C-alpha cells in the first residue's frame, strides 16, 4: 500500500516561518514527482496487461495446432511456457514436413521400381517378391523374337478383303494333305484293338471327310457362279440388257450341272428313286389309330 500524503501545514512559530517555507516547497515538489511516477507506473501496468493478453492469444493459437497427446506429455514433464510451446510447434511442423518428403520419395521410388525387372541375364526368369500375390497370367521369360501370325484372308498384303478364288488357288494343296491324313488314320484304325480308341479315331476320320465334302460343294457353287457371271458379261458385250443373277437362278443352274454329272456316272435313276421315296413319305397321310365317336354309335 502507498503511504497517504498529508497536505496540511503544521502551525509553527513565527521565527521558524522562513525555514518552514523552504521545507514546505521541497516537500510539495517531492509530492508532485511522486504523483507523476505513480501515473507512469499505471501506464506501464496497462501495457504489460495488453502484452500478456497478446501472448495468451498466441499461445492459444499454437495450442490449437498441437496434438492432445503431445500436450499431455509436456504437462507431465513440466509447465507449458512460451518457449516450450514454440519448440513443440516447430518440432511438429518439422515432423509433418519430413513425413511429406518421405511419402513423396517413396512414391517416386515405387513409380521407378514398378517397371524395373531384376535378372541375372536376359534369358533368366524374372525375380519377384514372395510377399505380393502372383497373377496366373504372366510372362516368365520374354521372347526375343516375337512371332507375328498372319492370316492371308485379312492381311493387307493379300488385298485386305477376302478373295475366295485367290485363296483356293494358293492354298488348294491343303485338301490333298487332308486326304493323305485320312488315309493314314484309316490304316491305323484297322490295326487298333481298343474299342474306345477306335471310336475316337473313327469320329476324327468322319469329321475330316465331311470337311472335304463341304469344301467340294463350296468349290462347285463358286464355279457355277463364275460360269453364270462370265456368260452374263458376254451377253452384255453382244448388246443384251444386263440381268441380275439371283440365288434362285444359281440353284437351278446347280441342279442342271448335278443331273449332268449323275447321267454321266449312270447314277441318275437311283437318285430319282430316293428322291421320289422322300417326297412320298412327306406327302403320306397317316390313318388315325382310333375311330371317331360318331362311327362307334352307328
UniProtKB/Swiss-Prot annotation:
Keyword Aminoacyl-tRNA synthetase carried by entry: no
One of the GO biological process terms: maturation of SSU-rRNA from tricistronic rRNA transcript (SSU-rRNA, 5.8S rRNA, LSU-rRNA)
Coiled coil: 88-112, 196-228
Protein name in UniProt: Ribosomal RNA processing protein 36 homolog
Function: Involved in the early processing steps of the pre-rRNA in the maturation pathway leading to the 18S rRNA.
UniProt-annotated stretches for the region Disordered: 1-131, 279-298
Pfam families: RRP36 (PF06102)
Origin species: Dictyostelium discoideum
Chief location bin: nucleus
